């Protein structure tokens, strides 16, 4: 299992691409996680292709971003950041916002 003391890692090239294309970064995601802006964590729905991978559902300015990740012994590796209109709708309905 992982703890809040574990460090986060990611691909720096992917981070730069996300900043340019989606106006979001792994640093922003980590900030929001540290602030408790986490709706839920789920197993990746396609465990055949992504075994052991999980997904953070992170709340950023009222919008849900899906952040697939892998837990290693020493760190959590963040794979990408995906804005999700469907998850945002589900979150809003569930929380009455």
Where are these regions (language model features)?
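Ribonuclease/tRNase effector modules and their secretory precursors
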Residues: 1-97
């Amino acid at each position: 299992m992982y703890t809040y003391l574990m460090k986060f890692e990611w691909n720096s090239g992917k981070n730069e691409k996300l900043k340019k294309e989606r106006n979001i970064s792994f640093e922003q995601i980590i900030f929001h996680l540290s602030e408790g802006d986490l709706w839920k964590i789920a197993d990746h729905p396609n465990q055949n292709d992504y075994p052991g991978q999980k997904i953070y559902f992170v709340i950023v300015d009222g919008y849900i971003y899906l952040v697939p990740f892998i837990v290693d012994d020493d760190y959590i590796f963040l794979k990408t950041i995906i804005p999700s209109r469907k998850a945002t709708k589900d979150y809003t309905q569930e929380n009455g916002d």
